[in-house]
A protein has these predicted regions:
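Alpha/beta-hydrolase-fold enzymes
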Residues: 243-350, 354-355
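Gly/Pro-rich cap/lid or specificity-loop segments adjacent to the active site
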Residues: 26-289, 354-653
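Secretory targeting and sorting signals
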Residues: 2-25, 43, 175
């Protein structure tokens, strides 16, 4: 759906508040964009509400008055229900660290008719976007925060006393200030990822102003867990679900992950990745890198589809596919533009309030020992299948390892959550905020409905390829019953298959002469693989603003480059012993001539003539066959993008 694709830009880090009381515009809100429907203004709040640290924060906000909103679109169109009372829709960004005003138009489009009669208001949380942007060059310059723990220490030193003033509690107080400035009373809150933590805390603190809660990819009230215990324990289940019924190469993808992780406990997987110049670069993969790769699949169906086969192959000693998909996912892990994501706010919020495996007053040199003691106290089963060593090296632990806390931290005992109607939306394949955590939160909310969205990862509003999430939200806001199961769920992207270890493992090409059937199939598999890699590289180049041509390496050797006329291929190897070179033309269907090299029995020429016709000579024998290819990609699949494994934490990039 078009609306789902637009919402995907939000990347699961947003908090929306739907108010049921009449809204009054603040006099400071003026038209401020080329889009005349959007108005902007500011709400000034204290930097430190205790007065200990002087200063203030100007919260930048945008407002789309109900009377200026175009009709039609969004979730409301899906369910023809009565119009809701006039009110306001507020949007808070999560992350923590992402500004919300860049998504004002996206929310207007996504909620469509459901916003009829309500103003839409977004604002940048303190320290993000245009709300007095918080900067820490030390953490802005690195993509994988876990590799540079000293960056967290330098950021804390730069921020000084301010570092303790960007907590969830501060965000809740800011949210209340904006609610008062806009002039609404009771509000329904939609939150995604970290936004659910803000939503739950706001509901706990200001229950009289909360009409209902919508929690999408919920972070537990005491989370996020720097040790990723829920993520670890849920990963075998998610691998099984990602594989679906089409993984004929394995009987249990979850057990493959468990067994492979056990192997990594003895030694990392070692192999090579072929770069865009055709060079073979040595790489290794341990349990921590595997953790970030699993998390990268939350926003990237292609990664999820690749992982079961890649893990299966790595388990039997061939890590080529796994190392390549890990390398591709990390290529997108570029440092974020601070205007789009404040890594300083992220560090300040997480390091001040996440429950670290050491005492808050622990000396830096003693934190490693206390971490080991905490891991031992939890026991190995708490970290199945990746193991406690991966937990100790997580991004959230390493980022905060040398951070001196400036705030007292969250209370150890919190009041119960309020008794308000709640809709909890959870992706079946979500590893950042797994289903198991959502179930615990649902048990604390007496009037909650938990909807598990199949074939969907983190942030159901942004990644659900069906209408399930939008329908559930629409019905819930209309005070109608919501089914706990999706009527027409998305289908998973068909899983990839393990790459052959030898030509004898390649299935014969149907209809081809027996003597060349495996070779011809190997050529076809090579072209399939290169086309898939070109598509992934194109996404990476677009996201990075890279104007270079799309290029990459073959799985086991060679390289490819995509130009205006098509793809040039130089000695690409997918099946061992079969090298493919030539040009795949940029035309409808597969058309091109390819030289095949290897032993005399496999060498020759293969020509794809279009219309599924393949001719040529292999091993001295002429042939002519017709390709019978079936595209098994469901038409409603949202392919998404390669997710950034940086800060693999709820709601972050």
């Amino acid at each position: 759906m078009c609306g789902v694709r637009v919402v995907a830009r939000v990347a699961a880090a947003l908090l929306v508040i739907v108010a049921a009381a009449p809204a009054t515009a603040d006099a400071r809100f003026k038209r401020c964009r080329s889009d005349a429907t959007i108005r902007c203004g500011t709400v000034t709040v204290p930097l430190d509400r205790t007065g200990r640290v002087p200063g203030s924060v100007r919260l930048y906000a945008e407002q789309v008055p109900a009377e200026d909103q175009p009709p039609g679109g969004g979730a409301g169109r899906l369910v023809g229900r009565r119009a809701a009372p006039r009110g306001a829709i507020f949007a808070l960004a999560g992350g923590p660290g992402q500004p919300a005003t860049q998504f004002t138009s996206d929310f207007l489009f996504a909620f469509g008719d459901q916003a009829a009669g309500r103003d839409i208001v977004t604002f940048d949380q303190r320290g993000t976007g245009r709300s007095d942007l918080l900067r820490c060059p030390e953490v802005e310059k690195v993509a994988l925060l876990s590799r540079y723990p000293e960056s967290g220490q330098k950021c804390a030193e730069r921020l000084g006393d301010r570092r303790g003033l960007y907590t969830t509690s501060d965000s809740v107080d800011d949210m209340e200030a904006v609610r008062r400035a806009i002039g609404v009373d009771r509000i329904a809150i939609y939150g995604a990822s970290y936004g659910t933590k803000v939503a739950l805390e706001y509901a706990r603190r200001y229950p009289d102003h909360v009409e209902r809660l919508i929690l999408d990819s919920v972070v537990t009230p005491d989370g996020p867990d720097p040790l990723y215990r829920d993520t670890f324990n849920a990963s075998p289940r998610v691998e099984r679900a990602s594989c679906g019924p089409e993984c004929g190469f394995t009987s249990d993808a979850g057990e493959d992950l468990v067994a492979f992780a056990r192997q990594l406990g003895d030694a990392p997987a070692r192999g090579f990745v072929v770069d865009r110049r055709g060079r073979r670069l040595a790489q290794s993969l341990g349990s921590t890198r595997l953790l970030f790769l699993l998390l990268a699949g939350d926003f990237a169906p292609r990664i999820r589809a690749a992982l079961p086969a890649a893990i299966y192959s790595a388990r039997r000693g061939d890590p080529a596919q796994l190392l390549r998909v890990a390398s591709l996912s990390e290529q997108s892990a570029e440092p974020a533009d601070p205007r789009d994501f404040s890594t300083a706010v992220f560090a300040a919020t997480i390091c001040e309030e996440a429950p670290q495996p050491w005492r808050r007053d622990a000396a830096f040199d003693d934190r490693a020992r206390q971490t080991d003691e905490t891991l031992a106290r939890y026991g190995d089963d708490a970290f199945t299948p990746l193991g406690p060593a991966a937990a100790a090296q997580s991004d959230l632990v390493q980022l905060c390892r040398r951070w001196t806390e400036a705030s007292p931290g969250p209370p150890s005992v919190r009041p119960p959550l309020p008794d308000v109607p709640a809709l909890i939306l959870e992706g079946e394949l979500d590893l950042r905020t797994p289903l198991e955590g959502a179930q615990r939160v649902a048990a604390q909310l007496p009037r909650s409905t938990l909807v598990t969205v199949p074939a969907t990862g983190h942030s159901t509003l942004g990644s659900d390829g069906s209408a399930c999430t939008l329908r559930a939200i629409s019905r819930f806001l209309a005070r109608e019953s919501v089914l706990s199961k999706c009527a027409n769920p998305s289908k998973i992207l068909p899983p990839e298959h393990p790459a052959p270890l030898s030509l004898t493992e390649v299935a014969p090409f149907k209809g081809a002469p027996r003597s060349i059937a495996r070779v011809l199939q190997a050529v076809d598999l090579t072209l399939n693989d290169l086309e898939d890699q070109a598509a992934s590289q194109a996404v990476l180049s677009f996201d990075a603003g890279d104007n270079r041509s799309v290029a990459g390496g073959g799985l086991r050797g060679g390289r490819f480059r995509v130009g205006t006329s098509g793809m040039s291929i130089d000695r690409a190897v997918y099946a061992p012993g079969v090298r493919v070179s030539g040009r795949l033309l940029n035309r409808a269907g597969r058309i091109g001539i390819f030289r095949v090299a290897g032993s005399p029995a496999v060498s020759g020429v293969v020509e794809y003539r279009g219309g599924g016709v393949i001719t040529g000579r292999l091993g001295g024998r002429r042939f002519r066959v017709r390709l019978r290819r079936v595209d098994t990609t469901p038409p409603d699949i949202e392919l998404g993008r390669l997710a950034r494994p940086v800060g693999a934490v709820p709601g972050v990039r």
